[in-house]
Amino acid sequence: MAGVDAFLKLDGIKGESTDKSHKDEIEILSFSWGCHSSTSIGQGGGGGVGKATFSDFTFQKKVDISSPKLALIAARGDHIRSAKISVRKAGGAAGQVDYQVYDLEKIYVTGVQISGGDGGVFYETLTLSPTKFKWEYKQQGDDGSLTGNMAVTVDRAANTAQ
């Protein structure tokens, strides 16, 4: 994510970020999530769309102080009460601005995978499954300032989105 920084703030879990706006959060190298909705087009008379299925959030990060605690939470089947993902980029005179923010609730740790070692760096693939999340995207104007936003809230337990 060249020119873009991303941070993960987990309730009760410290990371190693020294960034003044995201101190003690987890620095994210990359992350992904998505949704899929199947249709019945070409399978009979009409056409319809089924309910969407949302994938878990998968993060790539360096192994840090949060890694053992995340593995423990996964092993115990506990959940994390809340989390925030902040994605930022250059904002002109405003400096760095968070232009994408995800607020997650009741999050299960569904995967912790450690790999690497070449050059002494170990990486972690972390998979989180939130029960509910809100994604807010903030549009950036020509001067770099944030000018508008769009948001969606997904409740995976109720299988609803708005």
Which residue stretches match the model-derived regions?
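Glycine-rich, low-complexity intrinsically disordered segments
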Residues: 1-162
